[in-house]
Amino acid sequence: MFVSLWEFFYGHFFRFWMKWLLRQMTGKCELQRIFDTYGGAQRTYRIENSLTYSKNKVLQNATRVAQSELDRCIANIMKEKNICSEKDTSFQICMRTCLLQITGYKQLYHDVENVRKKPYDSANAQHEKMLLKLWSLLMPTKKLTARISKQWADIGFQGDDPKTDFRGMGILGLINLVYFSENYTSEAHQILSRSNHPKLGYSYAIVGINLTEMAYSLLKSEALKLHLYNFVPGVPTMEHFHQFYCYLVYEFDKFWLEEEPESIMYFNLYREKFHERIKGLLMDCNAVLTLKT
């Protein structure tokens, strides 16, 4: 109740008068003051909040503007806020960077979601080719005897046909597994080998798909904003999402071995512990979580 009242008074009264007072004192609007004071993710995050909670429709709509309309949008913001480009020469550049990151994050979520919604289809030649590529990347010296085979368990799938394991994350789970195996082949082989440990082993592919779900949920909840705003000086793309996934795979393997779980039966418990650790790291305004090998 108290929190709700504070949010109401802050949003409707206190924030307005505080902004007005600061503008009178500095001669600059809130957006300009943010650019003068902050850098990196803090700058973009605060600009996003300022635009989102503004009562001005031009500013509100800026967080959803199409990239083709970016320059016009910035010109409209400057007009609304009486900002002279000759007096504040950096405003347009700074605002453009922030809006590319803000709108890019929203687009990235939609792109990831669209891929996630696509189910694995064994009748799709591209899907089948990708699955067989995963096998060849992880088991280069061992031939797969048949498409439906118990051999899939060697790389951590549950049944004879991996397609059933992709139901939750769709083709996104396979794309991530292939991306890590192709771009970090040595690390993938090492992790696969460790996943076969007699006591601390786990199902490599199943855990990989589970970590796709973790990366997706963090993106959806906007927990990845600070990381991506720090890491990408423009529009974040699927490539950056895959890179974050690789970080999770590498770090989870280290975490699992360090924790020495009693058995795989405790996977969900340790998975949640790892999840909380990652969320804590992502709350740091200087967060940049990249795989360092």
Curated annotation (Swiss-Prot):
Domain ELMO: start-end pairs: 126-282
Keyword flag Mitochondrion: no
Entry GO MF terms: GTPase activator activity
Keywords noted in UniProt: GTPase activation
Record's keyword annotation contains Transmembrane helix: no
Its job: Acts as a GTPase-activating protein (GAP) toward guanine nucleotide exchange factors like ARL2, ARL3, ARF1 and ARF6, but not for GTPases outside the Arf family.
PANTHER family according to UniProt: ELMO DOMAIN-CONTAINING PROTEIN 2, ENGULFMENT AND CELL MOTILITY
Name listed for the protein in its UniProt record: ELMO domain-containing protein 2
Organism: Mus musculus
